[in-house]
Structures are given as C-alpha cells and as structure tokens.
Amino acid sequence: MSGRGKGGKAKGKSKSRSSRAGLQFPVGRIHRLLRKGNYAERIGAGAPVYLAAVMEYLAAEVLELAGNAARDNKKTRIIPRHLQLAIRNDEELNKLLSGVTIAQGGVLPNIQAVLLPKKSSQKTK
C-alpha cells in the first residue's frame, strides 16, 4: 500500500483548454479577462470557450475575405485597405462593423448612376 488511493491513473501531460476545444484562440486568457473585466460576478466554464470560438470564426472570416481582396489586387500582403474592402463588400460583416472606422482603409469606389455619362441610343455618322 503506497497511499495513492484506489489505483488511479498517473497524471499525464497537461492539455490546454484551447487544444481540448480545438481552437487557436487562448481560452485561458479570455477566461482571465472575463473575470478581471467585472462583466459578471461569476463566469461559467463554457463561456470563455464559446467566446473564443466566436472570435476565432470572425477573425477567420475577415482574413479569408481580406486575403481574397489582396489577391484580386495582385498583392501578397493584407493591408488595411483590403480589410476595408472585405468588410464593406460583405453585407453581414458591414452591418456588424458599421460603427467601426478602419485607419488607412479608404472608401468603397462608388459613382452615382446619375453622374455617369448618358448612353446614346443613336450612332453618329
């Protein structure tokens, strides 16, 4: 009798909560920030996992669209302009980030239809 209790397993290598959830975003850090931020008296164990998953999904979505915008402009590096184009051309992201100003993002190219030259139906001879 070695005093170990009833034949329990030896503790193996520790595994982060992010890797358990299959996420890249840090679940532990988000949990700490939720506790320190005084958002609520208590924070459940699932809340930081869910929040990390949502944040990771949004980041992946924006980066995917910004990468496409960069490729369309024949660039290999994403700049704020590509982020702006990606967000403003996507209906849902534009609604979510409508109050956000992106520094060095520029504006969407848009010319009102009335300002465009008239299409003449008859050809001049």
UniProtKB/Swiss-Prot annotation:
Core component of nucleosome. Nucleosomes wrap and compact DNA into chromatin, limiting DNA accessibility to the cellular machineries which require DNA as a template. Histones thereby play a central role in transcription regulation, DNA repair, DNA replication and chromosomal stability. DNA accessibility is regulated via a complex set of post-translational modifications of histones, also called histone code, and nucleosome remodeling. It comes from the Eukaryota. This is Histone H2A. Residues 1-18 have a biased composition (Basic residues). Residues 1-23 are annotated as: Disordered. One of its GO terms (molecular function) is DNA binding. PROSITE patterns: HISTONE_H2A. The lineage of its organism: Eukaryota, Metazoa, Spiralia, Lophotrochozoa, Annelida. The modification N5-methylglutamine is found at Q104. Pfam families: Histone, Histone_H2A_C. The modification N-acetylserine is found at S2. The modification Phosphoserine is found at S2. Its main location: nucleus. SUPFAM superfamilies: Histone-fold. It is found in: Nucleus; Chromosome. It comes from Urechis caupo. One of its GO terms (cellular component) is nucleosome. Keywords: Acetylation, Chromosome, DNA-binding, Methylation, Nucleosome core, Nucleus, Phosphoprotein. Belongs to the histone H2A family. The nucleosome is a histone octamer containing two molecules each of H2A, H2B, H3 and H4 assembled in one H3-H4 heterotetramer and two H2A-H2B heterodimers. The octamer wraps approximately 147 bp of DNA.
